[in-house]
Amino acid sequence: MSESELGRKWDRCMADTVVKLGTGFGLGIVFSLTFFKRRMWPLAFGSGVGLGMAYSNCQHDFQAPYLLHGKYVKEQ
């Protein structure tokens, strides 16, 4: 795997982590305010789920060395 491919995978991983963590946190806020009387655990749960999903996606991306954004990279 070349350095540029590795950099692209790290960039995609970090962007995915920010999006999923923010979405989980946002959903935690919504559920905390509407259903759970302003408790803190929905925020932690939503953030944890988002972080776990992002970690799983990153792990999958790094374990598949010949896939990059859904395209096969040919060996040279």
Curated annotation (Swiss-Prot):
Residues with the N-acetylserine modification: 2
Topology in membrane: Single-pass membrane protein
Stretches in topological domain Mitochondrial intermembrane: 37-76
Keyword Transferase: no
Keywords, in A-Z order: Acetylation, Membrane, Mitochondrion, Mitochondrion inner membrane, Transmembrane, Transmembrane helix
A Gene Ontology cellular-component term: MICOS complex
Entry-linked InterPro entries: Mic10
Subcellular location: Mitochondrion inner membrane
Gene Ontology biological process: cristae formation
UniProt-listed Pfam families: DUF543 (PF04418)
Superkingdom of source: Eukaryota
Keyword Transmembrane helix: yes
Transmembrane intervals: 17-36
Subunit structure: Component of the mitochondrial contact site and cristae organizing system (MICOS) complex, composed of at least MICOS10/MIC10, CHCHD3/MIC19, CHCHD6/MIC25, APOOL/MIC27, IMMT/MIC60, APOO/MIC23/MIC26 and MICOS13/MIC13. This complex was also known under the names MINOS or MitOS complex. The MICOS complex associates with mitochondrial outer membrane proteins SAMM50, MTX1 and MTX2 (together described as components of the mitochondrial outer membrane sorting assembly machinery (SAM) complex) and DNAJC11, mitochondrial inner membrane protein TMEM11 and with HSPA9.
Protein family (similarity comment): Belongs to the MICOS complex subunit Mic10 family.
Role according to the record: Component of the MICOS complex, a large protein complex of the mitochondrial inner membrane that plays crucial roles in the maintenance of crista junctions, inner membrane architecture, and formation of contact sites to the outer membrane.
Protein name: MICOS complex subunit Mic10
Organism, as annotated: Mus musculus (Mouse)
Lineage: Eukaryota, Metazoa, Chordata, Craniata, Vertebrata
